[in-house]
From Swiss-Prot:
Its main location: membrane. It is an enzyme of class 7 (translocase). Part of the ABC transporter complex LolCDE involved in the translocation of mature outer membrane-directed lipoproteins, from the inner membrane to the periplasmic chaperone, LolA. Responsible for the formation of the LolA-lipoprotein complex in an ATP-dependent manner. GO terms for cellular component: plasma membrane. GO terms for biological process: lipoprotein localization to outer membrane; protein localization to outer membrane; transmembrane transport. Pfam families: ABC_tran. This is Lipoprotein-releasing system ATP-binding protein LolD. It is found in: Cell inner membrane. ATP binds at G43, S44, S45, G46, S47, G48, K49, S50. The keyword Cell membrane applies. NCBIfam families: LolD_lipo_ex. The gene is lolD.
Length: 227
C-alpha cells in the first residue's frame, strides 16, 4: 500500500454461495484513497457498492485480497482491535440515520467519544460544538422522533465526524431525502470535508453529489473503473 494512504485495498474479491453455485460480486478491486481526498463510487443497483463499502470499513470479510485502514491491515487484527480502529479512524453515514431513538441528538453524537473513553464532560462539549457547526445547536436535547429527516441526517454526520476520523464512509447519504434537503446535506458534507481535511468515500446514485467529488469510480461487473 501507499504509506500516505488513508485507505487502500488490493485484489479485493467477494463471492457468495447460492445453493450449489458461487456468485462473484466483486473481483480484483483496487483502490487507494489519500488524506483529504473525496471519491464517489457509482454503479447500478445490485452491483456490489454497499458490499464493497462494508468490506472497506471492516464490517464484512473479503473472500480474497487485503484492506489497509490508517496503515493497519484489517485481516491482521482481531475483532476487538478492528472495532477500536473503526471507532478511531472511521466515521459512517448511511441512507437511514441509525440514530438510537431513546437518546437525544447530543447523546447520539457523544457515543463514539464515550466508546473511545473520552471523559463525559469533554465528550458533551465536543458533541455540542459539532452539532452547532451543522446547524443544530438549538436541538441538542431533541430525540430523533422530534427531528426532521434532514436534521436526523445532520446528527448522523456530526456523529460520524465527532472523533475526528481520517475517513468517512457514506452509503447513499442523501438517498432518503427530498431534493431541497439533499442539496443542503450535500453542501454541508463538502464544507466539512474541506475544513476538516477528512477523506470521504461516497457510494451514491446521485450524480450531482458524485460530480462534486475529486474522483468518480464506477463499479461494473465486479471491478472499479474510472467513470
Amino acid at each position: 500500500m501507499n504509506d500516505k494512504s488513508v485507505l487502500s485495498c488490493r485484489n479485493l474479491s467477494k463471492s457468495y454461495d447460492e445453493g450449489p453455485q458461487s456468485v462473484q460480486v466483486l473481483s480484483g478491486v483496487e483502490l487507494n484513497l489519500l488524506p483529504g481526498e473525496r471519491v464517489a463510487i457509482v454503479g447500478s443497483s445490485g452491483s456490489g457498492k454497499s458490499t464493497l463499502l462494508n468490506m472497506l470499513g471492516g464490517l464484512d470479510t473479503p473472500s480474497a485480497g487485503s484492506v489497509w485502514l490508517a496503515g493497519e491491515e484489517l485481516s491482521a487484527l482481531n475483532e476487538t482491535a478492528r472495532g477500536l480502529l473503526r471507532n478511531r479512524a472511521l466515521g459512517f453515514v448511511y441512507q437511514f440515520h441509525h440514530l438510537l431513538p431513546e437518546f437525544t441528538a447530543l447523546e447520539n453524537v457523544c457515543m463514539p467519544l464515550l466508546i473511545g473513553r473520552t471523559p463525559i464532560a469533554e465528550a458533551r462539549q465536543r458533541a455540542a460544538e459539532l452539532l452547532e457547526r451543522v446547524g443544530l445547536g438549538h436541538r441538542l436535547s431533541h430525540k430523533p422522533a422530534e427531528l426532521s429527516g434532514g436534521e436526523r441526517q445532520r446528527v448522523a454526520i456530526a456523529r460520524a465526524l465527532v472523533n475526528r476520523p481520517q475517513l468517512v464512509l457514506l452509503d447513499e447519504p442523501t438517498g432518503n431525502l427530498d431534493q431541497h434537503t439533499a442539496q443542503g446535506i450535500q453542501e454541508l458534507m463538502l464544507e466539512l470535508s474541506r475544513s476538516l481535511q477528512t477523506s470521504f468515500l461516497v457510494v451514491t446514485h446521485d450524480l450531482q453529489l458524485a460530480g462534486h467529488m475529486d474522483r468518480i469510480l464506477r463499479l461494473e461487473e465486479g471491478r472499479l473503473i474510472a467513470a
